């Protein structure tokens, strides 16, 4: 392994997640009434129901 690859591998393995996450609730997608889509699987299941 070359020196560049060794340096990259060391820096990758020694990295720590000390900071706060960048995602913020104020950027979450909301509906016009202020609710958030928290159950997308239920919505997809309901959309795929075939009416007879």
Swiss-Prot record:
It is found in: Spore core. The keyword Transport does not apply. GO terms for cellular component: endospore-forming forespore. The keyword Transmembrane helix does not apply. Keywords: Sporulation. GO terms for biological process: asexual sporulation; sporulation resulting in formation of a cellular spore. It holds the Pfam family SspK. Residues 1-52 are annotated as: Disordered. InterPro entries: SASP_SspK. It comes from the Bacteria. Induction: Expressed only in the forespore compartment of sporulating cells. Belongs to the SspK family. This is Small, acid-soluble spore protein K. The lineage of its organism: Bacteria, Bacillati, Bacillota, Bacilli, Bacillales.
